[in-house]
Amino acid sequence: MKSVEEQLALIKRGAEELLVESELIEKLKRGEPLRIKAGFDPTAPDLHLGHTVLINKLRQFQDLGHQVIFLIGDFTGMIGDPSGKSATRPPLTREQVLENAETYKSQVFKILDPAKTEVAFNSTWMDKMGPADFIRLTSQYTVARMLERDDFDKRYSTNQPIAIHEFLYPLVQGYDSVALRADVELGGTDQKFNLLMGRELQRGYGQEAQCILTMPLLEGLDGVKKMSKSLGNYVGIQEAPGVMYGKLVSIPDALMWRYFELLSFRSMDEINAFKADVDAGANPRDIKIKLAEEIVARFHGEEAAANAHRAAGNRMKDGELPDDLPEIELVAAEDMPIAAVLNKAGLVKNAAMARDLLGSGGVRVDGEVVDRTYIYAVGSTHVCQAGRKAFARITLKSE
């Protein structure tokens, strides 16, 4: 096992906040594998790279010799996490949750080592909890403390309804840490209240309090808003290798380093060497290719990554991407047809030219041929090619 200092450096890489660092150091000094917990509510079947920020950190803990608990919130998934929500979320059925959970498991083991992962379902203990135990759990916290949460406070102050079951979500998430005797819990920055609940409940149940590690919400391909399928600025981990590759090599240069830190398993020394190369005049696209190949290989294999790179090169053979690829930002109230985007960005002379190119296969988005039915999502960024020589990286921003 690495030294405490080496472990702490890797644990803190890319993290937003570590509470409490001194407590974690004491846990690490014992030289025993820690129990590292992260919970995921299977409310949607498909994961994107934003979800993998936590999973990547779990893998780093595994590589340090610790025990990872991948908690599937099949019970909490039927409640619906109210974090950051301005309205009550409709709960899912048990069947929907379990179906999504199976899909989750098949996806996360492309990152986690199955032999070093304990998969748990919080229905295992919550379904067995009787009325007396449940009352004991709810007595650990007050309504006044619950209303300290920003989202609950905003809804309460604006007379928006808050269902009683929504108060139960952070309590159940916190109790998961009691049931699993977690030493460390990971979560997004929007989960801090729930993670702190775990610390408080563990003390209430006579356990040593867990440390919490919050990870940032990954920016989407536009580099502005958080990655989200609904915003169209995402990279799904089950997307085809070529699509995944094309999206990653088209991200803004400044965003590349953020993705390296949170998504790559390369050492920070290697990443800093890449930065030095770019500062010395290297083409940022060459570095983005390394990032894209690494991530595609993780989910699809080395051969698929090599094929995606080769195919992208073949698609661009009639006009290599220029080093000074134009960056164009458009503003729109809603998603736009690709023809309108090309016209507004100036890649075509007029709407008629856009229609002709789309009809003849002369328009590519991230290297893939598209037709007139292609819709450009607000919040997304793509490399567009109209004809043989007109290229631009176009971001469609919301008004």
Curated annotation (Swiss-Prot):
Where the record annotates domain S4 RNA-binding, the positions are 336-396
Instruction: Report the catalytic activity.
Output: tRNA(Tyr) + L-tyrosine + ATP = L-tyrosyl-tRNA(Tyr) + AMP + diphosphate + H(+)
Its quaternary organisation is: Homodimer.
Question: Which GO molecular function annotations are given, in alphabetical order?
Answer: ATP binding; RNA binding; tyrosine-tRNA ligase activity
Motif 'HIGH' region at which residues? 42-51
Tagged with keyword Zinc? no
Q: What does this protein do?
A: Catalyzes the attachment of tyrosine to tRNA(Tyr) in a two-step reaction: tyrosine is first activated by ATP to form Tyr-AMP and then transferred to the acceptor end of tRNA(Tyr).
Where does the record say this protein resides? Cytoplasm
Family in the record? Belongs to the class-I aminoacyl-tRNA synthetase family. TyrS type 2 subfamily.
Q: Where is this motif: 'KMSKS' region?
A: 226-230
Gene3D superfamilies given in the database record: HUPs (3.40.50.620), RNA-binding S4 domain (3.10.290.10), Tyrosyl-Transfer RNA Synthetase (1.10.240.10)
| Pfam families documented for this protein | S4, tRNA-synt_1b
Q: Identify the keywords attached in UniProt to this record, alphabetized.
A: Aminoacyl-tRNA synthetase, ATP-binding, Cytoplasm, Ligase, Nucleotide-binding, Protein biosynthesis, RNA-binding
Q: Which domain of life is it from?
A: Bacteria
Which SUPFAM superfamilies does the record match to this protein? Alpha-L RNA-binding motif (SSF55174), Nucleotidylyl transferase (SSF52374)
Query: What GO CC terms are in its UniProt record?
Result: cytosol
Tell me the InterPro entries matching this sequence.
aa-tRNA-synth_I_CS, aa-tRNA-synth_Ic, Rossmann-like_a/b/a_fold, S4_RNA-bd, S4_RNA-bd_sf, Tyr-tRNA-ligase, Tyr-tRNA-ligase_bac-type, Tyr-tRNA-ligase_bac_2
Q: Where is it mostly found?
A: cytoplasm
In its UniProt entry, the species of origin is given as Pseudomonas fluorescens (strain ATCC BAA-477 / NRRL B-23932 / Pf-5)
Which residues are noted in the entry as ATP-binding?
229
- Among its keywords, does the record have ATP-binding? yes
According to its UniProt entry, one GO biological process term is: tyrosyl-tRNA aminoacylation
* E.C. no: 6.1.1.1
Q: What is this protein called?
A: Tyrosine--tRNA ligase
